């Protein structure tokens, strides 16, 4: 802007155009400069307004420029007011949400992810004593106290968890050395020598630009990691050996820092713990899946009860020319003896139980053959007695020489 106290209408238009351009561009981001220019223009204009040329075209351009500046200023003011209002609403909503969250759950300080584990203090101690992760009795008692205190501060999620004891902490360190891979590195890259392992860990931490605890004067002149690995392996170090060591080291550090629980989720441990608890009355029973279902046990069919009724028995050797069904015959000693008289006569003398019977008391030659001559030379054959009761008069009159015989005329 010109320093001349007198101003022309053309210079006035140029001054307004310059202010508009700087206001819209605002590269310098210095509002006081624009304010000073506007104040200077405002002071010069009233004194020289009467001496300005009345050029309608220039005056129209001045009106258009001032209108554009006015619209831009109002737009900037509206945007600024809207931004302030939205920011205030966002702050209020965030504060309200935080108050609601704090009211529904206990306040837990901002902690790292690994601190949510019950073994946080034990992992931290393991990580700080990698060269010799064997805590003393005093350190064990301190870790137990810190772990129990931090567990009690977490809240209701693990209230039912029993407090940690010293022997449990000892077992945890034994398992941690094995599961993390520390024992594997000790065996493979330190010859199972804890002194060599100590120097190897120090060299690794030093090569990784990590803080290492101060160590006394070492008997090893070199502090190079490759030299330690080559010396412990007893041979020149190969790229495969170095890569294997780096992989084992990274796996060990990852397990110590994060553990398994944070990788797979808390629900795995909760599920395992719930499966070991005895179900309480009223609690839903676990559903047996197909994989857990036992195969159905094959049971023998129930045995049918044996009938106590005696089946009728018959002689296995029927008489000659007999056509009767032997299954309907009555089982008697006389019947059996008569049916076998012609073929097994010699067996009567050898059977003690049959010695009391005399089938030939009415004649020794009457039963020499199954057939004999009767009235009118009619042939008579001996048949087995049917099941039934004989008439007593027939036996007394001698019509039937023996109880087991019946006469049939042919």
From Swiss-Prot:
GO molecular function terms noted in the UniProt entry: DNA binding
Matches recorded under PROSITE patterns: HOMEOBOX_2 (PS50071)
Region (Highly conserved between B alleles): 111-410
Residue ranges of DNA binding: 107-184
Chain spans, region Variable domain between B alleles: 1-110
Principal subcellular localisation of the protein: nucleus
Compositionally biased residues, Basic residues: 294-307, 375-388
Domain of life according to the entry: Eukaryota
Region (Disordered): 202-241, 278-335, 375-394
GO biological process: regulation of DNA-templated transcription
Protein keywords: DNA-binding, Homeobox, Nucleus
Motif Nuclear localization signal in this chain: 276-308
Coiled coil regions in record: none
Bias (Low complexity) ranges: 206-222
Region (Not essential for B4 function): 333-410
Entry function: The B locus has at least 25 alleles, and any combination of two different B alleles yields a multimeric regulatory protein, that activates genes responsible for the pathogenicity and for the sexual development of the fungus within the corn plant.
Family: Belongs to the TALE/M-ATYP homeobox family.
Protein name stated in the entry: Mating-type locus allele B4 protein
Organism: Mycosarcoma maydis
């Amino acid at each position: 802007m010109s320093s001349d106290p007198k101003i022309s209408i053309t210079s006035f238009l140029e001054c307004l155009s310059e202010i508009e351009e700087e206001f819209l561009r605002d590269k310098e981001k210095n509002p006081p400069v624009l304010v000073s220019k506007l104040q200077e223009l405002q002071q010069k204009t009233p004194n020289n307004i009467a001496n300005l040329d009345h050029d309608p075209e220039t005056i129209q351009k001045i009106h258009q420029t001032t209108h554009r500046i006015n619209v831009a200023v109002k737009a900037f003011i509206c945007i600024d007011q809207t931004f302030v209002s939205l920011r205030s609403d966002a702050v209020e909503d965030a504060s309200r949400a935080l108050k609601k969250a704090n009211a529904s759950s206990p306040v837990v300080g901002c902690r790292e992810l690994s601190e949510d584990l019950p073994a946080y203090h034990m992992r931290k101690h393991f990580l700080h004593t990698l060269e010799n992760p064997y805590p003393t009795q005093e350190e064990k008692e301190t870790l137990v106290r810190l772990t129990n205190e931090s567990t009690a501060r977490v809240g209701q999620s693990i209230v039912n968890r029993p407090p940690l004891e010293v022997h449990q902490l000892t077992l945890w360190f034994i398992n941690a050395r094995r599961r993390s891979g520390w024992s594997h590195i000790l065996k493979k890259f330190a010859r199972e020598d804890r002194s060599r392992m100590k120097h190897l860990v120090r060299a690794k931490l030093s090569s990784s630009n990590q803080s290492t605890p101060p160590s006394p004067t070492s008997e090893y002149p070199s502090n190079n990691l490759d030299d330690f690995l080559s010396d412990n392996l007893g041979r020149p170090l190969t790229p495969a050996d170095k890569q294997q060591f780096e992989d084992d080291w990274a796996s060990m550090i990852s397990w110590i820092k994060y553990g398994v629980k944070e990788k797979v989720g808390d629900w795995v441990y909760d599920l395992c713990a719930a499966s070991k608890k005895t179900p309480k009355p009223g609690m839903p029973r676990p559903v047996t899946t197909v994989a857990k279902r036992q195969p159905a046990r094959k049971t023998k069919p129930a045995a049918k009860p044996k009938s106590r009724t005696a089946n009728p028995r018959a002689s296995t050797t029927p008489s000659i020319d007999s056509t009767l069904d032997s299954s309907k015959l009555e089982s008697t000693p006389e019947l059996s003896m008569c049916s076998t008289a012609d073929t097994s006569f010699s067996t009567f003398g050898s059977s003690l139980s049959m010695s009391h019977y005399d089938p030939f008391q009415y004649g020794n030659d009457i039963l020499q053959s199954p057939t004999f001559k009767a009235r009118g030379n009619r042939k008579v054959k001996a048949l087995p007695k049917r099941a039934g009761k004989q008439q007593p008069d027939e036996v007394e009159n001698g019509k039937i020489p023996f109880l087991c015989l019946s006469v049939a005329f042919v």
